[in-house]
Amino acid sequence: MLQPKRTKFRKVHKGRNRGIAAGTDVSFGTYGLKAIGRGRLTARQIEAARRAMTRAVKRQGKIWIRVFPDKPITEKPLEVRMGKGKGNVEYWVALIQPGKVLYEMDGVSEEIAREAFALAAAKLPIKTTFVTKTVM
């Protein structure tokens, strides 16, 4: 699963997921899966979508993951009273804004890429769309 090797601080504030996305263009591959909605992806969801795509293309071509879960999410144990400090880090998430390219693919036909991205999108909690590289 994806997570940072080391961080400056173990726990972070909740914060807000506002603003516009960076990384809105398909830059490595030919086809991409772009987020339409706003939300957060856990490391498990990113990995599940990657596996679905890899199986769909039968390990042909190349896949790039353009998001990385770098925000720790903490949870307190069950049946614990409030207070007594912040909970333990349970999982890592990537904050997603609309327009962000999540995955890219190259070396396969558009039909196969569309099928693979459809399978991957079913694993994700945000709305996505299929995009192709625009040649200037």
From Swiss-Prot:
GO terms for biological process: translation. Keywords: Ribonucleoprotein, Ribosomal protein, RNA-binding, rRNA-binding, tRNA-binding. PANTHER family: 50S/60S RIBOSOMAL PROTEIN L16, LARGE RIBOSOMAL SUBUNIT PROTEIN UL16M. SUPFAM superfamilies: Ribosomal protein L16p/L10e. Part of the 50S ribosomal subunit. This is Large ribosomal subunit protein uL16. Gene3D superfamilies: Ribosomal protein L10e/L16. HAMAP family: Ribosomal_uL16 (MF_01342). The gene is rplP. Binds 23S rRNA and is also seen to make contacts with the A and possibly P site tRNAs. GO terms for cellular component: cytosolic large ribosomal subunit. Belongs to the universal ribosomal protein uL16 family. It holds the Pfam family Ribosomal_L16. GO terms for molecular function: rRNA binding; structural constituent of ribosome; tRNA binding.
